[in-house]
Structure formats: structure tokens, C-alpha cells
Amino acid sequence: MTLHAYLGRAGTGKSTKMLTEIKQKMKADPLGDPIILIAPTQSTFQLEQAFVNDPELNGSLRTEVLHFERLSHRIFQEVGSYSEQKLSKAATEMMIYNIVQEQQKYLKLYQSQAKYYGFSEKLTEQIQDFKKYAVTPEHLESFIADKNMQTRTKNKLEDIALIYREFEQRIQNEFITGEDALQYFIDCMPKSEWLKCADIYIDGFHNFSTIEYLIIKGLIKYAKSVTIILTTDGNHDQFSLFRKPSEVLRHIEEIANELNISIERQYFKQSYRFNNQDLKHLEQEFDALQINRVACQGHINILESATMREEINEIARRIIVDIRDKQLRYQDIAILYRDESYAYLFDSILPLYNIPYNIDTKRSMTHHPVMEMIRSLIEVIQSNWQVNPMLRLLKTDVLTASYLKSAYLVDLLENFVLERGIYGKRWLDDELFNVEHFSKMGRKAHKLTEDERNTFEQVVKLKKDVIDKILHFEKQMSQAATVKDFATAFYESMEYFELPNQLMTERDELDLNGYHEKAEEIDQIWNGLIQILDDLVLVFGDEPMSMERFLEVFDIGLEQLEFVVIPQTLDQVSIGTMDLAKVDNKQHVYLVGMNDGTMPQPVTASSLITDEEKKYFEQQANVELSPTSDILQMDEAFVCYVAMTRAKGNVTFSYSLMGSSGDDKEISPFLNQIQSLFNQLEITNLPQYHEVNPLSLMQHAKQTKITLFEALRAWLDDEIVADSWLDAYQVIRDSDHLNQGLDYLMSALTFDNETVKLGETLSKDLYGKEINASVSRFEGYQQCPFKHYASHGLKLNERTKYELQNFDLGDIFHSVLKYISERINGDFKQLDLKKIRQLTNEALEEILPKVQFNLLNSSAYYRYLSRRIGAIVETTLSALKYQGTYSKFMPKHFETSFRRKPRTNDELIAQTLTTTQGIPINIRGQIDRIDTYTKNDTSFVNIIDYKSSEGSATLDLTKVYYGMQMQMMTYMDIVLQNKQRLGLTDIVKPGGLLYFHVHEPRIKFKSWADIDEDKLEQDLIKKFKLSGLVNADQTVIDALDIRLEPKFTSDIVPVGLNKDGSLSKRGSQVADEATIYKFIQHNKENFIETASNIMDGHTEVAPLKYKQKLPCAFCSYQSVCHVDGMIDSKRYRTVDETINPIEAIQNINIDDEFGGEQ
């Protein structure tokens, strides 16, 4: 029973001395007494290599490299193990989660948090922490008895003690945790003869838990000798750099005193690890109070980059230089990091430079497609077949792998499901998934081609196969009563899915193609899944449980699964975190992410027990728990010290000025401290360095081409670029080995986001030999030619979702007003309040179920919206009644369609126009309402267009002149052409072109006292005043509002009279009959010009800017055209907005005779 302590700063030969001792013993007596080297889990492989790679060792049976848990197993093999089953991490958390749910109603502080998955994880960690520090439920109950304890802390401890006690009772005599196994190991030590003759070495630790100290105590007491290696100078000052390992030394001294033995200390002061004076000086002076500055010889570098990505790119380039120019091997290099954001960058950047590497971290399995499928399957059942988990399940491609182009089929199914609002048991309704229904996707019904029909039949078959599998799973699970039944049902369902065979086939293919790591992942996925099922049966067995609870507990277990990354080669760069990675004696170590906030890192308490409570327990009960945040904060300098002293040749520190989320970052204060130790240690700003040394960017062929592209792009933008890049371009271009992909990159240099003119032949292929279109299509072209090309040429459509859009509201209002108008023959003035409500209810009952597959009855929100729609309609009808009371014009026709060849007698004929290429233009559409008034054998017509959007309920004559607003003039033209079909007189003249804004008006009052019901009603009615353009003919004026008289402005039409009876300029929007005809004729010419441009093949990204507004703000195709307001302003078209459109139209000559039948 002897105790040795090797003490010294980093790199002073402590571990080397230990390894030398062990090797000498192995050489002298290969079969002698056992030698046990205890190290952290992440260090065991490295230490085993140290023995295996020694050519002087021909093998030995006496030395083992173990961590504490493996050592306990070694003892158990000798003296016998515990009879209880050991709980895995996943099994422990599943059990605790179930206990929490059962005991939720008894909890005082955590009752509301108990339902969340994360709470059971926190509670499991806290119980494990208590076990590590030998705190039992009885200890907690004794703490609770303290009357001076705060109520919140008391309630917290009562809750934790309740779960902890219940957990201990559940596992008593049946199960054992990892911490309990270590306690059993301590009890078994006296029985081990193997241990009594063993020499124990403990290396690589900087701190221990209470239970680990008890193990060390037992080893010292029962082993032949124990040697512990600590990185410390022996200073017990709590503010010392070596506070943490010195704290370990203090505990070891206490153990030695308890056992009444002395510690044979051996101090190591001579530095051996470092090959140069730079690293020696860095290690010796890092914690010095009085700085001794020396000249830096170039073995320490500090790099400053603009972004984290550029930082890792530079590290990759420097590793290539290390390998190529400095003859290092990849295994001589290590990268240490602390910010988790860097892990993704390593995976995405290092493979681009063909650098082999191994990251010493465990990745969660939850994002693997198989696990995502299983968890989504669970959520489908839990959520009663909601759409999001169903789509996630489908997109994993695990259950649909047998289908060709399964991802495309799932995309089509997703479009259909989102449009029709499929959720819940509607997934099971085969009628909803009839192939014919797919012809109506995107609101545009069309006849299916044979290929489309075959594709949609595949979609339906795929959906049916997946649904059958889910139904089988649901049925199997619903028949289970105990946890064992559920686990069996789940496994049998996976076999029904043929998942085992599918995974094994995929694994073999990956192995065959050289993707060994991916193949290994599949093995681990399946083994992990089976392990969770085994754990469930082990922990709960025949215990009754609801399916809902089983799925919750099972999901908790799946969350605990992690991939164990097995190194694929020995020669690779080691990557790990600064806190945990064990890399020693590397020729070059890169410490990345050296920013303030990362190194040092603000330490915040994350456990259920706060720092204050930990201190309270230590003071009141002498119970030591895991270190508090302030203690951990003091150890940040030691973390930095250990990380930077792992190298023996070179250390490179790096940091970026911008974080992963775009936030500004500052340099670590430790780097300032390091820089102060040297006279010539400058921070290398990478952008400036690369500008001066462009060759430093040319380390890897593929990546050099990408950097070359960036340099040439800058050169084309008239920026100054080093001649080296132009030389590099010529070398790469002329080299058959290097120039692959160069042409593709260079083509991007001249890319300017310009579209190509289609030409007449291709335009005919796209648009047909005649244009059959609505007015809105031509208006869309005027907004932007590319928008028209994308929508009508490429036929790109936004995914239609099961939700109400603005245009849906417009359609509803149109349909409801048509229904009511036809019921009363357009006589709105006969309506009273009772009739309005009756008709509104009838119309809504008839129309709303047809909207978006009965969307407005799908939820409480939409049912509320339906009532709002009814209220708007009632207000609108009141306004129409008011307007009809004072107008001689009578509504006669509603929702009147027009086209070149009418299908019914009620439809109107639209005159065919012709493009300059001779292509027929067939305009079609629908006029909301036509009002007529006849006097002296002359009929006057009003065009009334309902608009639910205020912005579109205005007739802008400037827009009309430039062809941006073509609707109203087209409608009036159609009506004038169809006097006989409309039953009008031989003479027909325009009355008004008017918009009616269907909306819910808002009236503002300063206070409640100002509200007058009568005035409120009048103000509301005035909000519905028609806007647009009116024929200045006196007959029309008099008929529009019979109340018109001098000094009166109508509140129903845009007309007002001056004192002398003339039309007022401010209150009237009028034009004479000839002007209206000229606008109509000019509108036709705009049609012809627009259609001719379409057939010419114009597809320019050229939005029309009007009144400082762009159509891009509401365009669905921005992701296609990539127009950018910052750099593409030259693309914008403009018009002369200063013109007076009335005066401008006077120059238009009328060629056609208006009022004639076509």
C-alpha cells in the first residue's frame, strides 16, 4: 500500500516517466503482477497505441488500459458481479419519465413542467449527479427538515426527493445504475486478489467526483501501489492557474491521512515536450504575475478572419502546407474547438480539401431517416394523423424506398394534401384520393395525359401502401396491454415494414461502395432500436401501460441514442473540444474560435440545483456537489492552458470577427495575454495577408479554382487583383489535370441574370397559335414580361394551401352578391333588414361549403371568419340598397361571362383582335354587374366591378393609358358590342365605369360620447361610395343620383355640382363620351401591342415601377427571377407619370364605330 504522486506543469515528462516505468516492468517480466493504467474514456485508445506502437515491446499480458467502469467489470469477473440488471442511460431516463408522469399530481414546484420531455432529462441528470456525489434520498429529506430553508428550495427538494425515492424503490433488488455499480465495485475491492498485487497508475484526470474519490481510496488501500499523475505545481492557492488539479491533490492528501500513509511526491520541473523556446516560454509565463517578454521565433501564430467559415478554410490550407511542405502526418495534427458551431464547419469544409479527420463527439441518432421515420410514426398516432408528422414520415423515404422517384411522388402527394386540407382520418378516405381529383390541383382543372395519369396512380398507390403500414402498426399497438406486448407489436410491425431486410441491404450496398462509416451507422441504428425495446421490456416487463404513455416513453428512449464514431484510419487529424479532447504531443495544434465569450466561456448553472443551493448544502450539511459556476469560471484559464500545451512543435490560435448568426465577436482576452508575452507576435489579419500573399490561397486544386473565380470576378469589377491570379488562371486553363470544371466556373463570371428572347416559333410552341386569355394576363405582362413568361409560359404555380387567401374572399363576395342579386332581380332598394339577413344566410349556406373544399367549416377560426363575411355582406347590401334608392340605373346582369364563342345565350361575344404577327387574340372574362338606364330610345350602361381590396378599387386613367389597367375599358367595350344580347335599344352609350369596394368600414371617433348611431350609419354608407369614371352627359349625371342639385356632392357616385349647376372639378370624376370611346379604342391597341410582344418572345426581367412602387412586392416569382432592388434598378421600366391622361387621349383617332353589334 504505497502512494506516489507525479506533480508538474504541462510537458514536464510526468506521463513519459509513467509510460517508461510501465514498459520497463513489461520488458523485465511480461507475465508479472498486473499493471493497470486508469485514464478517461477518451484517452484509453491513445494510450493503448503508445504500447502497441513500441517496437521494443513484444507483447505483454500484465498491462491493461482501463477507465473506472471497465476496471469495475474486471474486478467483477474475478469476485463475482451484482445480480441486478444494469440500467442503460436510456432505460434510466425512460423509467424516470414514467415515474414523473405517475407522480405529477404530487409535485409542488414542478407540476406544470412535468409534462415536458426535457424535464425528465434534467431530473435524470440531477439524480445521477446526486449519486456521483453520494447524496441519497435520505440526505435530501434531512435537508428539507431545515426550517430556515426557503420555501421554493424546500418544494424543489421535496419534488426531487419524491422522484428519487420512487426511483430507488423501483430499482431495488432488481436493477442497478452505473453509479450504483461503482459503489458495488468499492465494496468488492477487499475480495480481489488480483487487485492486491496490482500496480495502479492514474493519468489524464483534472478532477473527480465523490464516488471516484472513494474508488481511489479503495485502490490506495488494497492495491500494491498507486501512482497518480497531476498537472499542477502543487500550489493550493484557490486563485492559482492549477486550482482544479491542486484541489484533487488536496483530496488525495486527505485520503492519505485517513489511511495513515504518506505520499511520495516527485516534482517534474524540466520541460521536455516542447521543441522550441516559443512554446516553452508560453507554458512557463502564461500565469506569470511579472511578464518576461521575449522575441517570438514563429512557432506561435494568431489568425484573425472575417467569418468562421473563412477561419476553417484557412486552417485547412495550413494543414495541407503542414503535410506537403513540413512532412507531417495527419495524425501529428490536432484541432481543438469549443463553440459547437464549428463542428458543422469541419464536416462541410475539411472533406473539400481531402483531409481525413475524426471528431471526438457523439452525434444524436434522432436525425437519421430511420429514426425520423419511427418518431414521426409515433407522432402520427399521438396526433391523430395530423398532416405535419405524416409528411415527415413520407419524406424520410424509408417506407417508400421501393418506388422509383419516390421523392417526386411524395412531393406531388404533399401538394395535393396541403391543397385539400387532408388531416386526421381523411387520410383513410380513398374517395378523396381519386386520381381524377389530381387533375384539379392548383385550382386549374385540366384533362390528364396518360403520363400524368400513370404518375398520379403511382402517387395513390404509394399513399395506400404507407397508410396500410400505419394502420397495421396502429392495430398491432392498440391490441397490446403491457409494455412487453407493445414492444413485441412494435418489432413485429418493423418486420411487417420489412425494415430489417431493407436496412441490411442498404448497409451491404454502402459497404460495397466504400461508405463504411455510413454502413456502420445503419448497424448502430438497428442495434440501438433493439436495445431500446430490450430496455423497455427489461424495465417495465408485463406492467400495464396505455399506448399513449408507451409511445411517449419509447420516444424518450430514442432521443438518448447516439452514434459512436469509429476512426476509419489511423492517419487522420484529431478534432475535439478543448474541455474533453485528450491529445498530447502533437506537432501542430490549432485552437479555433478563440473569441471572448467562448474562451473564457461564461458559465451558467444548468442543473435543477442552483449554485446558491449547492453552497447552502456545503455550508449546512458538509455535502459537496458538482462545482458551482463561479468555480468553473475560475478554471477557464486552466482549460486554455491545457489546450495550448498539447503541442510540441507549433500552436496556431484563430478567431473570427463574426459569429454563426452574424453577430460581432471580440478576440479572447487570453490571446491578448499570450500576445503580451512576446515582442514580435502579431495578429495576422487573413484578408490583408491573402491580399499580399495570394499564393497562400493556392494550396488545393479544387478550392484554388473557387478562389480564382472570386478573384477574377473582382478583376472584372475593376478592382485591383494580384497578377498571380491571372498567372494561375493561365496555368490551370492549360493543364488537362487541373482545368476540369474551369469552364463552368468561368461562365458564371459573365452571368448577368438576363433572360433570352424566345422568338416567334418557340413562343407559338409555348403559348399556342392563338391567345386565349383574360384581361389580368395582359395586365400581368405589363407589370413584368418575365412574370407573364413564368406563369403562362413555364406555367409555374405556387403551391396551393388549405387556407383562405385574399382572392378567395373576393370570389366569395362575388358569388354571394350574384346569388342575392339574382334572387331580387337586382332591385336592392326593396330590401329591408330582415330580408338582408335572410338572403345573406341563404347565400352563405349555399356558397361557403364549396369554397376550398369546405375550408370555412374546418375550424373554429374559419367559422368565426364565416360570420365576419356575413356581417360584411349585410353591410354591403345596406349600402347597395341606399345607392339603389337614389339611382335610376337598375342592375340587370350579374357575373356575365364573355368569350369569342359563347357557350350559352347569357354569355356575351368578345371581338377577336389580331397581333402584328397575325395571331388571333381571344379575350375572355366576367363582368360583375351591368346596370342600365333607358331614356328616349337610348340605353346607358354602367359597369360595376366588385373589389374586396381597397388598393384595386380605384380607376387610374394614367394606368389605363399605359395599358396597366385594362379591365374596365374592356368590359365597357364588350357591353357596347352586345346590345342585342343584353336586350338594349339600338343606341347604347357608356354611363359609368365604377368600382364598388366590398369591405368592413371603420369609423374613428375621439370619444364614446361622440358616437351618434344615425350619423354612424350615414358615415358607414358613405364608405361604399363608387369610384371610377362617369360619362359627363347630363342625362347620365341626373340618372346616377336623383338628388343632385347645385352645391351638392353625391355620396354614392363620384359626381358633384357647383353653385351654378356645373360639374365640380374636386368632387367629380367625369369625361365626355368621345373621350371614353378613345380610351376604349386605345385599350384595344394596348391589347394588340401587348399580345404582339408576347408572341415576339419577350421575357425580360423588367418590372414596371409606378408611383415608387414595384409589382415585385407581391410577385410569386422573385425566387425565380432573382431581381434585386439594390443592384437591378436599371432593369426597372418607368412611364411618364406627369401626363394628363385626358389630354393625352385626345390624340387618339377612332377607327371603329362604337355601339354596333359584333
Curated annotation (Swiss-Prot):
<keyword id="KW-0269">Exonuclease</keyword>
<protein>
    <recommendedName>
        <fullName>ATP-dependent helicase/deoxyribonuclease subunit B</fullName>
        <ecNumber>3.1.-.-</ecNumber>
    </recommendedName>
</protein>
<dbReference type="GO" id="GO:0000724">
    <property type="term" value="P:double-strand break repair via homologous recombination"/>
</dbReference>
<keyword id="KW-0411">Iron-sulfur</keyword>
<dbReference type="InterPro" id="IPR038726">
    <property type="entry name" value="PDDEXK_AddAB-type"/>
</dbReference>
<dbReference type="GO" id="GO:0004386">
    <property type="term" value="F:helicase activity"/>
</dbReference>
<keyword id="KW-0004">4Fe-4S</keyword>
<dbReference type="GO" id="GO:0051539">
    <property type="term" value="F:4 iron, 4 sulfur cluster binding"/>
</dbReference>
<feature type="domain" description="UvrD-like helicase ATP-binding">
    <location>
        <begin position="1"/>
        <end position="275"/>
    </location>
</feature>
<dbReference type="GO" id="GO:0003690">
    <property type="term" value="F:double-stranded DNA binding"/>
</dbReference>
<dbReference type="InterPro" id="IPR027417">
    <property type="entry name" value="P-loop_NTPase"/>
</dbReference>
<keyword id="KW-0378">Hydrolase</keyword>
<dbReference type="InterPro" id="IPR014140">
    <property type="entry name" value="DNA_helicase_suAddB"/>
</dbReference>
<feature type="binding site">
    <location>
        <position position="1115"/>
    </location>
    <ligand>
        <name>[4Fe-4S] cluster</name>
    </ligand>
</feature>
<dbReference type="Pfam" id="PF12705">
    <property type="entry name" value="PDDEXK_1"/>
</dbReference>
<keyword id="KW-0227">DNA damage</keyword>
<keyword id="KW-0479">Metal-binding</keyword>
<comment type="function">
    <text>The heterodimer acts as both an ATP-dependent DNA helicase and an ATP-dependent, dual-direction single-stranded exonuclease. Recognizes the chi site generating a DNA molecule suitable for the initiation of homologous recombination. The AddB subunit has 5' -&gt; 3' nuclease activity but not helicase activity.</text>
</comment>
<comment type="similarity">
    <text>Belongs to the helicase family. AddB/RexB type 1 subfamily.</text>
</comment>
<comment type="subunit">
    <text>Heterodimer of AddA and AddB.</text>
</comment>
<dbReference type="GO" id="GO:0005524">
    <property type="term" value="F:ATP binding"/>
</dbReference>
<feature type="domain" description="UvrD-like helicase C-terminal">
    <location>
        <begin position="269"/>
        <end position="583"/>
    </location>
</feature>
<keyword id="KW-0234">DNA repair</keyword>
<feature type="binding site">
    <location>
        <position position="784"/>
    </location>
    <ligand>
        <name>[4Fe-4S] cluster</name>
    </ligand>
</feature>
<keyword id="KW-0547">Nucleotide-binding</keyword>
<feature type="binding site">
    <location>
        <position position="1112"/>
    </location>
    <ligand>
        <name>[4Fe-4S] cluster</name>
    </ligand>
</feature>
<dbReference type="Pfam" id="PF13361">
    <property type="entry name" value="UvrD_C"/>
</dbReference>
<dbReference type="GO" id="GO:0046872">
    <property type="term" value="F:metal ion binding"/>
</dbReference>
<keyword id="KW-0067">ATP-binding</keyword>
<dbReference type="GO" id="GO:0008409">
    <property type="term" value="F:5'-3' exonuclease activity"/>
</dbReference>
<keyword id="KW-0540">Nuclease</keyword>
<dbReference type="InterPro" id="IPR049035">
    <property type="entry name" value="ADDB_N"/>
</dbReference>
<feature type="binding site">
    <location>
        <position position="1121"/>
    </location>
    <ligand>
        <name>[4Fe-4S] cluster</name>
    </ligand>
</feature>
<feature type="binding site">
    <location>
        <begin position="8"/>
        <end position="15"/>
    </location>
    <ligand>
        <name>ATP</name>
    </ligand>
</feature>
<dbReference type="InterPro" id="IPR011604">
    <property type="entry name" value="PDDEXK-like_dom_sf"/>
</dbReference>
<keyword id="KW-0408">Iron</keyword>
<keyword id="KW-0238">DNA-binding</keyword>
<dbReference type="InterPro" id="IPR014017">
    <property type="entry name" value="DNA_helicase_UvrD-like_C"/>
</dbReference>
<dbReference type="Pfam" id="PF21445">
    <property type="entry name" value="ADDB_N"/>
</dbReference>
<keyword id="KW-0347">Helicase</keyword>
